[in-house]
Regions:
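N-terminal signal peptide c-region/cleavage motif recognized by signal peptidases
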Residues: 15-17
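Beta-propeller blade repeat segments, especially FG-GAP/WD-type strand-to-loop junctions
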Residues: 20-26, 59-73, 110-145, 183-204, ...
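Repeat-based blade/solenoid architectures
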Residues: 29-41, 77-89, 148-160, 208-228, ...
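Gly/Ser/Thr/Pro-enriched helix-cap/hinge segments flanking short amphipathic alpha-helices
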Residues: 30-32, 422-429, 433, 441-586
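Calcium-coordinating acidic loop motifs
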Residues: 44-46, 50, 64-65, 91-98, ...
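Hydrophobic beta-strand segments that make up the repeating blades of beta-propeller
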Residues: 50-56, 101-105, 172-176, 241-245, ...
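Short consensus segments that form the blades of beta-propeller domains
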Residues: 78-79, 115-126, 180-185, 217-219, ...
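Solenoidal tandem-repeat scaffolds enriched in leucines and small polar residues
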Residues: 144-254, 263-282, 291-304, 320
Length: 586
């Protein structure tokens, strides 16, 4: 009888262990399903340290102590109902301690004059819509201010904040698309906008070496950019710029040499694309060979992370590719940083080589009997969902009807990955955007995900998606339970002549007794159409009962380093620039 009792208890414990890892979609419980939403942001917009939600660039839902979200009707994010905001990126532009907004609009106001081989402005298309800067009053209510950004039109599909010159104000890198979609080589120039004392912005491309030309196919051509990123790729304390190219063109890594000009070193470090550059299509595709500059990828997103805890920032890039495009069309890939001794060059490992094959709905090309497939990896990010100090990979796929899903790949001890999406109870097809953060402040990260119906017609949705007709967001709450500890960190800089208020560009190292050093950076966006995670740090600590040291490398002109020792786990702390004491927030 005793043996049976013990056996019964063991079965219960094992069952509990199996059920202890997983996510639950609580969008309805949290009151966010009344709004159609493709684009999503998690960001604290009223200064209470709880993450609020922005849906489709226009609805602001304030977080009530991690329990429910309520619409803020007077946010003014949807300031012109006729203007369709393409992306929103949030950061403290004026250093007043609350988070402001860059609101991007895709303006295609030009036509291509084939006879004279030039672009011509079409005033009939211009409705006066431009990009805007909106300042926050601290409660989540925004007002438009006049800046030089609004004096010109462009077609942004990516934007990221960084303080490239470490003057204490965050600058804005704007990644722009085609002047007119379908005209293959006509692209707007990407722009680095320097923040002028929180009141205006200046286009400084010429001053800092970022100017590109309209002529296509050269090393200095403007390229259609569908995303952007920023990180300190080479550990020199300066934030570098990642420009992500569409149309099978090369990506750019702009090395920050401040006070000297930026230089494009993407080819030297193998960030531009993979090694297959023949440009050939499969024999069953009636299409000629592409030139070398058109034999790379369609890169939408990038996720920087020191995933292997070796002190260097690695990258994961999300790509769109198709069976018909051939082997020279880049696949999504992990770019492993090989460090100082190798010139910080990347080793590229295709996603297909580090995880299990994708499950697809089979489609047959009728004429040739060829199985067609698409990879629509528009959004990528990292999440240590089980707090084991090994960041796990999120891939958000969309836009094609062959089972493009939200997927999580668990990082194993040998730094390989395993698809655990089904094990974690996640079921989400058609990703319109992702943002990752701790919504309920319980010490693990949750996932906010938008819904896209791109190429998913009613017939398809009826057959495979239970006939859903409203693209509402999902809020996947992390309900993984284990004994692993954690630590959350908020940074606050002093502002002008010191570090920007939210520490964008800061590097933080977390030292634990087991000898692990986790390296994290605070980012102001990374990816496609405003993809952005909150400017804060949350790390797992495994079974470590304390943090021996937190080391902050502040993004100021003095390159100051601040050290906090002997930090207790399982709390969120606030660290202010050059102040010895820390404050517990949660």
């Amino acid at each position: 009888m005793v043996k049976k009792t013990y056996l019964f208890l063991i079965i219960i414990l094992i069952s509990h262990s199996i059920l202890s890892e997983g996510f639950v979609n609580k969008a309805e419980d949290y009151n966010i399903t009344d709004y159609k939403s493709k684009r999503v942001n998690l960001v604290d917009l009223n200064g209470d340290y709880y993450l609020d939600i922005v849906l489709n660039n226009k609805w602001l839902l304030l977080n009530d102590n991690g329990k429910i979200f309520e619409l803020k009707k007077d946010s003014n994010l949807n300031f012109n109902k006729k203007r369709k905001t393409v992306l929103s990126v949030f950061g403290d532009i004026d250093n007043d301690g609350d988070i402001d907004c860059y609101s991007g609009f895709t303006a295609r106001y030009e036509d291509f004059d084939k006879e004279n081989n030039k672009w011509v402005y079409n005033s009939k298309k211009d409705k006066g819509f431009r990009d805007r800067i909106l300042l926050n009053d601290g409660t989540g209510k925004f007002r438009i201010i006049k800046t030089n950004i609004s004096k010109r039109y462009a077609a942004p599909l990516g934007a990221v904040y960084l303080d490239f010159d470490r003057d204490g104000y965050i600058d804005l890198f704007q990644a722009n698309d085609y002047r007119k979609y379908g005209i293959l080589y006509g692209c707007y120039e990407n722009i680095l906008w320097k923040n002028i004392n929180g009141k205006n912005f200046e286009n400084i491309n010429e001053k800092v070496g970022l100017e590109t030309v309209r002529e296509y196919g050269t090393s200095n051509s403007s390229r259609p950019s569908y995303g952007a990123g920023a990180c300190d790729w080479n550990n020199d304390g300066k934030i570098d710029i990642l420009s992500l190219s569409y149309g099978r063109q090369k990506n750019r890594l702009w090395k920050n040499n401040y006070p000297e000009k930026f230089t494009d070193i993407s080819e030297k470090v193998y960030f531009d694309g993979d090694e297959i550059r023949h440009g050939k299509y499969p024999v069953w595709v009636d299409r000629g060979k592409e030139k070398e500059f058109r034999a790379n990828g369609n890169t939408f997103s990038v996720a920087p992370m020191d995933y292997d805890n070796d002190g260097d920032i690695d990258l994961f890039v999300g790509e769109i590719t198709h069976a018909w495009a051939g082997s020279s069309s880049d696949l999504s890939a992990l770019l492993i940083n090989t460090g100082k001794k190798n010139g910080y060059k990347f080793v590229r490992i295709k996603a297909s080589d580090i995880n299990f094959p994708r499950k697809r709905r089979k489609r047959i090309y009728k004429k040739h009997g060829i199985k067609l497939w698409n990879n629509g990896d528009l959004y990528v990010s990292w999440i240590d969902y089980n707090r084991d100090m090994l960041p796990d990979l999120i891939i958000g796929s969309s836009d094609y009807p062959d089972k493009q899903r939200l997927k999580i790949y668990k990082q194993l001890e040998d730094h390989s990955f395993k698809n655990v999406t089904d094990k974690l109870n996640i079921n989400w097809e058609g990703v319109g955007g992702i943002s990752v953060g701790d919504v309920d402040r319980d010490g693990d990260k949750d996932i906010l995900v938008g819904k896209s119906f791109m190429r998913l017609n009613k017939k398809y949705r009826k057959k495979y998606l239970n006939g859903i007709d409203k693209n509402v967001a999902g809020l996947w709450i992390n309900e993984t339970e284990n004994d692993n500890n954690w630590l959350g960190i908020f940074l606050r800089g002093k502002g002008e002549n010191f570090s920007n208020k939210f520490g964008i560009g800061a590097r933080v190292k977390i030292y634990t007794p087991d000898g692990t050093i986790q390296t994290r950076e605070i980012y102001g966006g990374n990816g496609h159409c405003g993809q952005q995670n909150p400017p804060e740090i949350l790390v797992g600590l495994k079974k470590n009962k304390k943090v021996e040291k937190v080391e902050i490398f502040w993004p100021n002109k003095n390159n100051s380093v601040q050290i906090i020792k002997n930090v207790k786990p399982n709390q969120y702390i606030l660290i202010r620039e050059n102040e010895k004491s820390v404050k517990q927030i949660f």
